[in-house]
Each structure stands twice: as C-alpha cells, then as structure tokens.
C-alpha cells in the first residue's frame, strides 16, 4: 500500500485536523468546540469521518479519503474492521510522512503502527520511545478485568512519563491523547485538538498555546436526562415513578453520554418510565458492562436492557462470552439487546428488504446472542437530511439537533419498551395468575399432521409439561389423565366442525375482524375479503385449540398457499391469512396471554415475510407476535432455524434432545443374505459348496432388490446398511433416555468426549426445568447447537441455543476438512467436473464451523482471509501451483437461513468466485470459472460483474424454493413446473457487497454448464428421505439443471460426513440405503409407531419425500415403491393399524404411492395396482367416516 497514493498538489486552505473513527459520536463535541479552537488557531478545521457509514454511502468514503489527503494532523481510532482498513489505509500510508502528526490509538495494529508524533515513530520498534512503551505495557490479553487494568495503566503512565525528559514526552503525548479521546466530552475533544496542534503544528506561533489536562469522569455511573447534572453515582438521585410496576436495568455507552449525544437513550428512558417502571440507566467506561452491573444493578432489576449494540464484555474487536454468561447467570433476569444503527441511516434501514447488513448482523446481533441475548430490536440511528420517509410516522431530523446526532426511532422504541416491560411483569407475576398460550402446528394441512413437530412426540411431551406446570402452581383445572385424552381434547370432540383439524375455541365474526385488524388492507390484498377461505365457515374466522384454565393449547394455522401452484411461483412470501393473523391477535388481546410457548420445531411465524434481521413495523413476524414474550421449545441439533426464531419472533429458545440413535441392524431377507454371504466368505476357494451358495445368495439378493453381480460390493452394502445410524422413535420431553439407549449413544460419541459427564446428564431431566425457568421470565443460559453424538457439549439441554461466532467461520479445521470433502467428491465422479451445483445450508455449516463453506472454497481454489483479530475479512486465491488442478466453477445455492445467519460468509463466497473470475494471468484450461464467465459474456452480452456472480438464494425475507410444497400438495402437473418454482424463488444472485439482484437468465446460463449437483447430509439424525428440505433444494436445482440442459440427466451426489472420514454416494444409492435402513426397517418404523398418530405422520412423510426425489431427479428405483406399498398399505394388518392411529396420514400415504404410479415413477403390475387402489379407497372412506366401524 505504501508509496503508491499520489499526494495532492497542495492542502486545502487552513489547518486541517482530521479524525477517522468508527462512528459519529465525536462529531458533535468537535463541532461545538470548533469556534473556541478557531479563536486561538485561526483557519483551523476539524472534521470527523465515520467508517461505519462508508459501505452504504460511497460519497462519505470519498470525503474521508480527500480529508486525509488534505490533512495536517490525522487522528485515527476504533478502526478494527478489515473493510474499513482496506478502504482508508492507502491514503493514510501515503500522507503519513508529510503530516505534522499521525495519532493511531485504540485501533487495529496497522493503524497504530502509523503513529508519528515528534520523536515517537511506531514504525520503528527499536527506537527509544517504542522500547519504553513495550516495557510499560507488559503483557496484556483481552478478557475479564483487562479493560479496567488498561484504563488504570492509561491514567498512570502519563504521570510517570511527565518527569522523564526528551523523547519520552512524545510517548506521554500519545497516552494523553488516548485519555482525551476515551473521556470524549466536548472539553476533552477540544483539549486533545488544542494539545496536538499546540505541540506538533508547523506554525511556530501556535507552539506556546496550552491545553487543559484530560478531565476524568466516573468509570461507572448512572445517567438520566431529567436529573440535574444528568450523571450521578447515587441511585437515590434518579427520578422514578411512584409505585413502579417493575425495575429495568439499562446499559449504555459512556462515550455517547460524555459527547452529549443521548437523544436515543433519553427516548428509551422516558418511554420506559411512561409505562410506570423504575429505571437504573447505567454506563461503564470501555466496552465491559460488568462493572456497571455489579455496582448498580445486581439484585435490583427485573430485566436487563443493553443499548450499547455490542456484546456484554467486548466490542468490535472481541467478546468474552464466558465472563458475560457468568455475570448474567448471577443476575438471572431476561437479557435484551437493542441495536443503534451505525452502518446505515434509519431511512436506509427502513427502506431495505434485508434489514441489517452483514457486519451489523454479526456484531450487533450474533455476538450478543452468544451471551444469551434475546429480542434484538433496532431503536436508533442517524437521519438522512430528508428523514425516514418510508415509515408512516415520517420522522425527520430534529432541527435543533446536530447533523450527526443519534436519533431515536419512536415506533421501534415503543415496541422495544412494550416487550421489555412485558418481560419484567412476567417475572414479577404470580404463577397462579399467569396465562400461557401454547402453540402447536399442523403442517402440511390435511395430512394428519396436527400436533406434530420434528423429532418430538408432541402430545406425550405436552402431557408431561402441562402436569409439571400444574404442579408448579399454574391454574389449569382438571387435566386429561392420559396422553390420548389430551390429544382428543385438543384435536377431537364436538367442536371439530367445518372440516377443521382441531377444536374450535373461538369464533371471530367477520365484522369484528375488520374492525380490529390494523393491517387488513395487506391481508385482503393477498387473500380476498374477510373472513377469507381458511378456518372459516364464511361468517366467522376460527381459532382452533382448547383452554385448560389459564393455559390455552392452540393450533397455529398453516401458511394458506400450500395447494395453490400460482402463489408458489411468486418470488416472495405473502401476508398471513385471516386465520393466521386472527390467531395471534386472539392470543394477545382476547386470551390475554402473558407469554407464549411454541412447542417444537417449527412453526410458520418466523418464516413470514419481513426483514431478515432488525425488523420494523411492516414485517409480519413483528406484527403478529407484537410485544408477547415467546418461549420456544426447539431441537438442540438445529441452531440455524432456532436462531431465526430468536431474531424474528422474540423467541427465548429452550433446547430438547433429538431421539436416541441406534445402528440399523439387519432384518428379514437382509439378515439371511448376510448369513449366507458369511458362510460363503468362510469357504476355501476350491470348496464344492461355493457354486450352490453363490446361487443362493444371488436368489436371496434378488428377493430384496439388491445387486449380487459383485459379491464383495454386496457384502459392503450389507455392512453399510447394518451399521447405518437411525433414530429410534421420537423424543419425549420429561422422559430421560433408557439405560440401553444411553449406552448406545455414549458408544457412538468421539473417543475424546467426556462420556461420564454425558452419561450423568442424560439420566437427568433438564428440559421441563428449562421451560419453567423461561416461563418465569428468568435468564436462560446459552449453549451452542449441535448433534449429541458429535457435540456432547450441547448437554444439558433446556438451554438457549445459539450459533457459532460468524467472525470465526470457517475455522482452520473446517477449511482442512472441507478440502478433504472436495477431494472425495472429485474422486467419486468419473471425470474432473468443470462446474458443480452445490447446495449450502446454514445448519450444517453452523454445526461444522463451516465445513461445507470450506468445501466450496476448496473446489474454487480459494481460502478465507482473516484480520489481525482472527476475524473473517474476505477471500484470497490459492495459487494454481499449490492447488494442483484447475479451479472448478461452483454454482452455490444458499438456503434462506444461511443467507440470514451467515451474511459474512455469503460475501466471502461471492468474493472468492469474483477473484477466480478476475484471474487474468491464468490459462482458461486451469480456471473453469473464468472460462465460463467469459463464455457467458460472449453469449449473453452480460457485464463481467454480473457474469461472475455465483452465489444464489431467495429474495430478502423469503425462504425455500416451494418445490417441496408443490410436491406435498400434489400441486404440479409437468415436472418442469418444479423448475419454474425453483428458478422463481432461487434466482437472486448475491454479490461481494452482500446485496442481491434477480438474475433468472444468469441462473439458467450457469446451470446449463453444470456437470453434477451435490449436497452434504446435515445431521446424523436426518436422511434425504426424512425431511422435505433436501429435495426442495438439491432436488430443485437438479430439476432446473435438467431443463437448462435440454432434458439431460444430471448426476446427483450426497456427501455423508456424519460418521468417520465421510462418504460420497450417488443419490440413488443414498435413497436405497435409507429405504432399507429406515423406511422398511421394523426397528425404525416400530419405534415411530410407539408414538401413535405422530409416528404414522412421519412414516407418511418418508413416502412423500421419496416421491419428491422421483419428481425432481428420477433417481428412485421402482422397487422402493413396491416395497413401501407391500409394507404399509397392502399388508392388511399394518394398514388397519396405521389407519386406527392416523387415518388422514395413512390415506395420504396410499394416495402418494398411487400418484407415483400415475406419474410413471414405477409401474406396478395390474394386480398390485388394483390392490393398492382398493386399499386407498378403503382408507379414504375411513378418513371421511363413511366406512362402518
């Protein structure tokens, strides 16, 4: 960077002191101090430039660059983010030697090293001042107490140096500048400038002008806008309401208070007190909130609200979550963080589809979540000159406020305060008076899915939780005495009329709905006039569920578009149906819940349209949940979707275990083949029995549809099936694992796992305790999400799941492992592919610390670049000589959740692809990305930047391709309609700036060049036939690729990293393995059927998901449908059993098998087809109540 930036021919008129920092909090003090400075230093100019503004406002970056190039003195601090450093370092480096002084402090080492103040030159580490500095500093590492020690050192060292003559005085000046800056009041900012100019300006007449010593302010204190003096250390001096209903602790940044830039804090404090709560608004010097908590808040508050925007201990450079959690556990109150916008204006945020940007999301939301923070809410920012015009309130800058001052967002502050006060009141409420709304799900509709959730036996778990709640003091009346009675009470009975899947608990007349619904226009624009078409008799809107005293168990309405193919082709989502909106308003206002409990994974609320992070009042999840506290019971192995629920539905997560795992084992004909093969393998080569035994094996293999042409391969496939891990049934909250299941789980854990700890915790019940703790309005400690077998540290469950620190992803291990995965994939395919379609989910990346990201980078021949703090900063290319093969063109399709939770990684992948495409000096035969980009430009006329885009996902605020919904509802005709849906939903290309543009033509172009499609298995608990997300994403892109290539079949591979070194299989082999190890395995399906209706629904899902693979890839062998039909529909005893447990799911299963035949995915013989049709008719009649019992 050095020496290449041209200097301006002359500096602008006057003497220019330029301050480059992270935000604008010093702008006000500098502007107010300027007239007094100009009195002593005529023609002096002081400008403050905030790096946080540069990404969204290039003009601000240009102004900062010009200011640096025209500066006499530069002060640079709080610059830690690589994007900011790369933007400004060239100019700083170019002018540094010509400045009167360069002061780099509290910043990245690259900035600090530029410091030049008289004889102090930090580029010369051996110089006298630098040697002295090293001695004075000693060893220092970030962590608990480090900030307090550093501040003490900062005050002490200038006193020590004052009496050391010569060069030490410049070192003293550097420490004094830090004191001035960190005590950043108007007086101190003025004195800092006065001191620097008076000491270092080349104008000799100014050298004698003195500056006041730094003013010391309290390191911790209390602040209130309506208190004389505004700052105190005496809580008794704070104005408080009479008889407060609760007490809220507030954490603020001292820097804003000293700078008198407090309009945003003032608004929150006043709004809270308008609700009748007492406030303890505390601040601490530095970025460690613990001293303020210990001094003023411990044992005195009902909720803690942080307005700092950072994690509790740390800031833009690091966070110490262990120290934070220790403090918050002792405090034991809800911990809420609110976000002040620094990287965009309020108007920009409000107008954006995504909400917060990548760095904002990571720094302001993801890092505090690791501390256990919840309910992220934007509450303030700075205004554009025109104000925030896209909000109905039309807020404009305060004409009396300084141009760079923080401004409150009144609408968001009202929402924030409502939520915080509700939490505090919940904590103070009496259990016997507390009202709880428990939310169950019923997706997909008409499938016997009411009251089901992934991995969870809902009604067994609910039965245990409700009885525990009653024992804890909740008023619930007489509870059902059995699980079946509870299920019947909610889903059956005299009020299940009008074809509804559950009891009708309330009827809302259409006129009442119209009068009480704030966003009626939006709902009716999507779904027609009230009362709509869902959960209604044409007059009333129904709320489904059953009330048990102060606890209501309700069934969340479905999205509503499941059976409408045209709606499924829209690129974004829709407003909720009348019934969905009515459900949540009824819970809030009519039932008057004090808190909600969403029961299991997962509902539709958090997937409603709106911003990804940092929602506003136009976002549907925010509109629906309102100010209600929300406890969310969630599977411990899904941190990605749990995090989405946190950010978009006020959720405090309480984790639960997934079902126990076991080895599949062998059954029926499979066991017989293994026995015969075992005998054969034991025979000597010349044994006369070999020929007959080989014939027997081949006959046995034919009977179970296995290929016996290579007996060694057959043996390997049998062992693979036998050793495959399967889930045993569903998890029941409140029921610890059996000793047998526990032993099998422990045996599967890594050798280095603490099995004794895991064994102890698995015998204990933590989940109901965690739920009751959360419902009491207390702090739920955080825990990383993950699979129990691979990550035993998820124990104990009953805690608040969070994702991995995005700044650290991918880790060094993930990069190495990803490269190994990439090598396995390339070795599996017969030829070296030029282009690969790769599906990336948030969940498997979060649980593997970025393994699939590492795989994508390795295929392209790139790697992540990290800054001096170990934080992700971008991408760089691996030289071809080191890579040893050509760069593969990777078309990356991200899940909507990946896009939301890993925005930095989205930018990383986009930058990596761009760098590959830009490698002009590489031969095209060694760089398939560049070759394809140039070909695309030639064929289509696209510009280089567009043609280089390789990262695709949904539009902002949208999720999924809807291929799964089309399949699930049998809502497609020709399979190309699935490609239509995929392209409509997944054609948004994300660039190096993290922003998206719709690029259907580009997606079609890059897919036309794809040689294979690939995805990793997400979890040991899941298979590609277990959930519909796999064929929605991988199947969807395979179908779109087939169409883009004129009907040519695309090889599809699955990477199974769940055990050992990993395996790559063809999709056909993967489906066959899962069908044998899971779907047809009595050990698997009997484990499910122990849970009744919910088990039948899961078996049906396996069948539907198999159909989804046929529809999208055609890679399901016909025998799969034959065996499924024989096992679950054509067997009279089994058919009767399934129908008695769940008539809707069993009927749907038979219909799916017939649909597979109708669509020519298999061709059953006439007798089988006739028997299947008869069985389906019988099941349908039974479901409709026609057949005689």
Curated annotation (Swiss-Prot):
It is an enzyme of class 6 (ligase). Pathway: Porphyrin-containing compound metabolism; bacteriochlorophyll biosynthesis (light-independent). GO terms for molecular function: ATP binding; magnesium chelatase activity. Keywords: ATP-binding, Bacteriochlorophyll biosynthesis, Chlorophyll biosynthesis, Ligase, Nucleotide-binding, Photosynthesis. Its EC number is 6.6.1.1. One of its GO terms (biological process) is photosynthesis. The keyword Nucleotide-binding applies. It catalyses: protoporphyrin IX + Mg(2+) + ATP + H2O = Mg-protoporphyrin IX + ADP + phosphate + 3 H(+). It holds the Pfam family CobN-Mg_chel. PANTHER family: MAGNESIUM-CHELATASE SUBUNIT CHLH, CHLOROPLASTIC (PTHR44119:SF1). Involved in bacteriochlorophyll pigment biosynthesis; introduces a magnesium ion into protoporphyrin IX to yield Mg-protoroporphyrin IX. Belongs to the Mg-chelatase subunit H family. This is Magnesium-chelatase subunit H. It comes from Rhodobacter capsulatus (strain ATCC BAA-309 / NBRC 16581 / SB1003).
